[in-house]
């Protein structure tokens, strides 16, 4: 469960290390986001000479959350960290590699590019 002011790790090689959620997309009163949801983020930490700079505002899709997500078969999945992948204006990932596992829920949300780049889909 990600809300405004939550900090997330970045799970791609765009150059950002940490981002903070500044808006949950999908309705004016929407408070929380989970795996597969798109949020607006601000870059809080970035490595030098990277594709993104500190202070940039971008969209991101959540790929891992500490809060468990219930699946249709009744099972739950949760991760050790909150992580997101940065997206361009066109909805494509900014980075060319994805680090760490991602949740299978992204497949239902049509993030096939992220699924194909990920080393493991849980």
Swiss-Prot record:
Q: Which InterPro entries match?
A: Ribosomal_uL14, Ribosomal_uL14_bac-type, Ribosomal_uL14_CS, Ribosomal_uL14_sf
* GO biological process: one example: translation
Keywords, alphabetical: Ribonucleoprotein, Ribosomal protein, RNA-binding, rRNA-binding
What the entry lists under PROSITE patterns is as follows:
RIBOSOMAL_L14
Name the SMART domains on file: Ribosomal_L14
Q: Signal peptide location in the record?
A: none
- Gene Ontology molecular-function annotations: large ribosomal subunit rRNA binding; structural constituent of ribosome
Naming one, the record's GO cellular component terms include: cytosolic large ribosomal subunit
What the protein does comes down to: Binds to 23S rRNA. Forms part of two intersubunit bridges in the 70S ribosome.
- Known partners and oligomeric status: Part of the 50S ribosomal subunit. Forms a cluster with proteins L3 and L19. In the 70S ribosome, L14 and L19 interact and together make contacts with the 16S rRNA in bridges B5 and B8.
Q: Which HAMAP family match?
A: Ribosomal_uL14
What family does this chain come from, according to its entry?
Answer: Belongs to the universal ribosomal protein uL14 family.
> What is the name of this protein?
Large ribosomal subunit protein uL14
Which species is the source of this protein?
A: Lawsonia intracellularis (strain PHE/MN1-00)
State the taxonomy lineage. Answer: Bacteria, Pseudomonadati, Thermodesulfobacteriota, Desulfovibrionia, Desulfovibrionales
Q: Which gene encodes it?
A: rplN
